[in-house]
């Protein structure tokens, strides 16, 4: 029985899931918007939001925790130097999921997951 077990399995074993979400979190931090399936996007929120909350207070310990989850120094630097200060006043809700139809090959529901208040989106809206 799987009572009270949270999180989606996504037909992967635990190490594959952990690696996949680490890679996806790094991609989301690096590009600020990625396209993926809807269930993966919903689950990715549970990985990325705590990382950004961690980045709001800059310390060596927090940087090491972020590195342990992402294994990428470039991503850790962007988290603490750009995203932490950008979301300092926001109490959670750092990501937005936009549904993007269905994939042609297998009709999987697709979605964009993006960071809210990203500069590229603000520039496009101003034009």
From Swiss-Prot:
Part of the 50S ribosomal subunit. Contacts protein L32. GO terms for molecular function: structural constituent of ribosome. The keyword Ribonucleoprotein applies. GO terms for biological process: translation. Gene3D superfamilies: Ribosomal protein L17 (3.90.1030.10). It comes from the Bacteria. It comes from Vibrio vulnificus (strain YJ016). InterPro entries: Ribosomal_bL17 (IPR000456), Ribosomal_bL17_CS (IPR047859), Ribosomal_bL17_sf (IPR036373). This is Large ribosomal subunit protein bL17. GO terms for cellular component: cytosolic large ribosomal subunit. Belongs to the bacterial ribosomal protein bL17 family. Keywords: Ribonucleoprotein, Ribosomal protein.
